[in-house]
Amino acid sequence: MIVPVLSRQALRHASVARVALPSLTRWYASYPPHTVVKMPALSPTMTSGGIGAWQKKPGDKIEPGEVLVEIETDKAQMDFEFQEEGVLAKILKDSGEKDVAVGNPIAILVEEGTDVNAFKDFTLKDAGGETSPAVPKDEPKNESTASAPTPAPTPAPEPENTSFTGRFQTALEREPNALPAAKRLAREKGIDLRNVKGSGPGGKITEEDVKKALASAPAAGAAAAAYTDVPISGMRKTIAARLKESVTENPHFFVSTNLSVSKLLKLRQALNSSADGRYKLSVNDFLIKAMGIASKRVPTVNSSWRDGVIRQFETVDVSVAVATPNGLITPIVKGVEGKGLESISAAVKELAKKARDGKLKPEEYQGGSISISNMGMNPAVQSFTAIINPPQAAILAVGAPQKVAVPVENEDGTTGVSWDEQIIVTASFDHKVVDGAVGAEWIRELKKVIENPLELLL
């Protein structure tokens, strides 16, 4: 007995839905033993469907898992698969036919070895006739469709109904009709079997078909391998492990503010002009110093989460993010609360050079109590958020300076607009250590110092 499988992907990751449908009927009568394949119901509410492309033609053998025909509904296009062997003897509904009622005959199948030519003149009437799609109960019944067909001179015996279990799958999800060797070769060579025409029995793709496709499309094969696997360095593995740990273990929260740096830039220019080349201060040097002052005023931020305790540090050791050819590293400027701007600037430059040259000592990058990551050298970066450097509890992310129009009130009472240099900074805090109000207080102290930069000189 020939048993079909209907398959359909109802959802992207849907499990197989099992159904039982009386879609096969076994007939004997004046024709050789055969099976009538009927239009299946793909859902409880389906009353009719359309016939898509037939994947087999009369005389073709059907093997387990092969698609016989596509069934179309108003929502999807389904494959009609079989799980046992048989031969297609007659197609009763051609491709493109619409509104074929559920239960109406669509094809005839026979066992292998049966004379298919015996079904050349086989008609729908021979298969038991067809009915119209079910009519809703509130509509009058059409008497013409309810009348029985003219009985045949020799009544056929009662059909043997066969139920089956099956599953549904969209046609797009269909596995290519290919021999195992062809599938293996296609997988090795990166060939998409959906683009290969089969020359084997029933359109099955052979190994030779895959070889021909490979020879005729060298460009496609080259495009499929257009990438390079870069070995992961030890440093990259360390960065990945630490940042993954931080995101997983530290509940981040973020506080942002706009810093007016117009006064700071004027002070920086004045100090650099009077330095006679002894130093050249950067905005980052001022920010590092300001972080030291803010962290002494709000010491909770200058802490780290340890097993059983929160460790609060006496000195503010700022880890400065430096990009190197091998990845990001954070050398430490220690005790910034007690250092002057010139000393901080010299330490940052020396540590950054060592970092790029790969000459940092472990004690120069291991530890630290708080971090800063500055992308201000890139004018495209207005703001960003940074991941906390564990086991620290805070990191400051610094964007590029932006000219912002701000309203001003003149001495004569009139109003106008002036341009102000501003930087957006965003602090990331570990909520295990720092509460929201504490983080906001730290940002307020940082803003106060930066916008009144003479405090940095005290």
UniProtKB/Swiss-Prot annotation:
Boundaries of the annotated transit peptide in chain numbering: 1-28
This protein's encoding gene: mrp-3
One of the record's GO molecular function terms: dihydrolipoyllysine-residue acetyltransferase activity
Organism of origin: Neurospora crassa (strain ATCC 24698 / 74-OR23-1A / CBS 708.71 / DSM 1257 / FGSC 987)
Homology family: Belongs to the 2-oxoacid dehydrogenase family.
Protein location: Mitochondrion matrix
Pfam families named in the record: 2-oxoacid_dh (PF00198), Biotin_lipoyl (PF00364), E3_binding (PF02817)
Name under which the protein is recorded: Dihydrolipoyllysine-residue acetyltransferase component of pyruvate dehydrogenase complex, mitochondrial
Catalytic activity: N(6)-[(R)-dihydrolipoyl]-L-lysyl-[protein] + acetyl-CoA = N(6)-[(R)-S(8)-acetyldihydrolipoyl]-L-lysyl-[protein] + CoA
Residue intervals of the Peripheral subunit-binding (PSBD) domain: 177-214
Class of the enzyme per the UniProt entry, highest EC level: transferase
